[in-house]
């Protein structure tokens, strides 16, 4: 049950409440960015655990990654430092009272009273924006740069693009997605209640199994997985990315209407008809055979 996430939340709380621990964490980050091999190796071990967990969980939903780009590699490869030097040359920066490197983004329509972007901590270690800029500079030379972000990251992405414009570099395009909501509120937030995907998937299997038991005498785990995971995926994917998904299990597992079980059932029926036909299906349809108004209307509805 996602032990790494539980451990992270526990440790993060302790660090937030203990100034000494916070300083130790910052020291480790400093060593990481300055190429300490021991720290880098320990860091990689933790990242690998997280990545393997993601791959395992998402493979159950038939979701696969083509390639991984590690944010941390931009730290010890010094690419964040290179990006910072380029930004220094623009002259559009200052150091605040905490000695943090701050990019001045005046002149860009960002909808901020004070359009600035903080890039480093007071000790010089990088923050997320600097790493994202370094990544954008690198990936921007290798084709299209499209990022997928939560809708609450729109301003942040505009700030990153403003920095890239200052450097006269290619900006990144973004696809924004909204939140998945349950009856009790957001499914996932940085703070507060979090529903893990792993738990959400377990709930899908449980509810699909219950639904099948009510309909059929015999069921198997494979059928429950196909229907449960299908309901989960389709229930989210059928909604436009920019709209909130109001996820309701009763609707998602309904065998009637615009749902995954209905589509799966229709597919099974069609497959059964084709199997009984016992002939080779034509590769191209001959629409000249449709000589009645009703047939044409039916085809239009099926293709809509």
Residue spans for each PLM region:
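NTP-dependent nucleotidyl-transfer catalytic core
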Residues: 1-304
């Amino acid at each position: 049950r996602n032990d790494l996430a539980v451990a992270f939340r526990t440790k993060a709380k302790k660090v937030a409440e203990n100034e000494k621990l916070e300083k130790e964490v910052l020291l480790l980050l400093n060593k990481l960015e300055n190429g300490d091999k021991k720290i880098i190796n320990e860091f990689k071990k933790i990242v690998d655990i997280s990545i393997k967990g993601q791959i395992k969980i998402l493979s159950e939903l038939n979701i696969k990654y083509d390639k991984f780009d590690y944010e941390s590699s931009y730290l010890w490869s010094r690419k964040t430092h290179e990006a910072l030097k380029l930004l220094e040359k623009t002259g559009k920066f200052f150091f605040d009272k905490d000695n943090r490197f701050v990019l001045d983004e005046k002149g860009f329509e960002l909808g901020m009273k004070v359009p600035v972007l903080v890039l480093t901590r007071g000790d010089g270690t990088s923050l997320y924006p600097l790493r994202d800029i370094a990544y954008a500079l690198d990936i921007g030379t290798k084709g299209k740069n499209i990022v997928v972000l939560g809708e609450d990251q729109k301003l942040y992405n505009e700030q990153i693009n403003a920095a890239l414009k200052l450097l006269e570099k290619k900006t990144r395009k973004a696809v924004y997605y909204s939140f998945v909501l349950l009856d009790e509120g957001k499914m996932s937030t940085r703070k507060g209640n979090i529903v893990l995907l792993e738990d959400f998937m377990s709930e899908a299997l449980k509810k699909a199994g219950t639904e099948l038991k009510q309909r059929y005498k015999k069921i198997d785990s494979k059928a429950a997985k196909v229907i449960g995971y299908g309901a989960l995926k389709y229930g989210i994917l059928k909604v436009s990315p920019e709209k909130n998904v109001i996820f309701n299990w009763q609707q998602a597992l309904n065998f009637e209407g615009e749902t995954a079980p209905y589509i799966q059932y229709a597919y099974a029926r069609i497959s059964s008809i084709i199997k009984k036909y016992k002939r080779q299906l034509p590769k191209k349809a001959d629409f000249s055979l449709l000589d009645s108004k009703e047939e044409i209307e039916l085809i239009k509805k099926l293709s809509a």
